[in-house]
Amino acid sequence: MASLILGAPPRVTVALPSSRLSSSHSETAGVSLSCFTHQFSLSTSSSSSIPLVYCGRGDRKTAKGKRFNHSFGNARPRNKSKGRGPERVPVPPAPPRKDKFENDEKIKIDIDESLFSN
């Protein structure tokens, strides 16, 4: 019954009569199962744009989805404007800082050529 609610085809097993008494011999009925899969494929193609159940990492309203999106907060807040505080005044951009390693100083490097000759 739960498989019908979720949209999965139910599993039908038929025990075949055998001369040996064995409980491990059971086969699925191919005719009825193919009928269920045919109906299932038709129903999924018409409603493929809407997922049946949308939960997990991508759901921003669950705790796992909040952690995945790096968003910390209530999963389903009641009042969205509550607790935000007054609006902040936009701050003008700061002037660019001078890099302490960048300067216009040039250093003369003397290379001893005798080290390279063999």
UniProtKB/Swiss-Prot annotation:
Pfam families: RPS31. The keyword Plastid applies. Part of the 30S ribosomal subunit. This is Small ribosomal subunit protein bTHXc. Keywords: Chloroplast, Phosphoprotein, Plastid, Ribonucleoprotein, Ribosomal protein, Transit peptide. GO terms for cellular component: chloroplast; chloroplast envelope; chloroplast stroma; endoplasmic reticulum; ribonucleoprotein complex; ribosome. The keyword Plastid applies. Residues 1-55 form a transit peptide.
